[in-house]
Amino acid sequence: MKTALVCGAGGFIGGHLVQRLKDEGYWVRGVDIKEHEYTDLPCDDFQVLDLRSERNVRRAMKAAVGDLSITFDEVYQLAADMGGAGYIFTGDNDANVMHNSAMINLNVAKVASEFKNPPKIFYSSSACMYPEYNQLDPDNPKCSEDSAYPAAPDSEYGWEKLFSERLYFAFNRNYGLDIRVARFHNIFGPQGSWNNGKEKAPAAMCRKVAEVAHY
């Protein structure tokens, strides 16, 4: 049986990923700083841990039973300090967004590289890392992989995502980590945040319509 660690399992995408991995027959451990807000996750093991702590990342990555020098087959790194436009574009949360997310990724890359047989790592990046000048024309967005440079993200959130992409690929070159990166766009759907500034645009619009209809 394959094993997977989902960092950020208490979030929207992480929760759906846990379900998909279980459907595919994986043994899954979920880790997050909080439990999932909307559903009971089908994890084989769920741990509430702050992954800004290297010690907690070591704890999360160790196999559930047996030889603790063995880690998971796959690690899905979705944990981050993030939210919708009301959270990441105001400037009020820039320091936390950059510090907290960078610490998590620094810890995950470092700890994974120390195992004799490191796990495969998937990192969830964001389209926010693309240059602002490539996103000004909604009819002609430039989001090809090679359009990321010259770098000029429009938010500190985007800069941190770009930094962490480079971090993981540096660990690939120097330590042989097997890395995969996906640059997510505006992901939304069931069990996603819908208020408090961390919701995505579609959820925010639905909430506003519902609020107006209520009155």
Language-model-detected regions and their locations in the chain:
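N-terminal Rossmann NAD(P)H-binding glycine-rich loop of SDR-like oxidoreductase domains
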Residues: 4-24
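SDR active-site strand-loop-helix element
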Residues: 7, 31, 75-81, 121-127, ...
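Conserved glycine-rich Rossmann-like NAD(P)H-binding loop of the short-chain dehydrogenase/reductase
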Residues: 26-35
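Rossmann-fold cofactor-recognition segment
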Residues: 42-54
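NAD(P)H-binding glycine-rich loop region in Rossmannoid oxidoreductase-like domains
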Residues: 51-101
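Conserved Rossmann-fold NAD(P)-dependent oxidoreductase catalytic core, especially the SDR/UDP-sugar
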Residues: 106-154, 180
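NAD(P)-dependent short-chain dehydrogenase/reductase
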Residues: 133-142, 166-215
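Active-site helix of classical SDR
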Residues: 156, 160
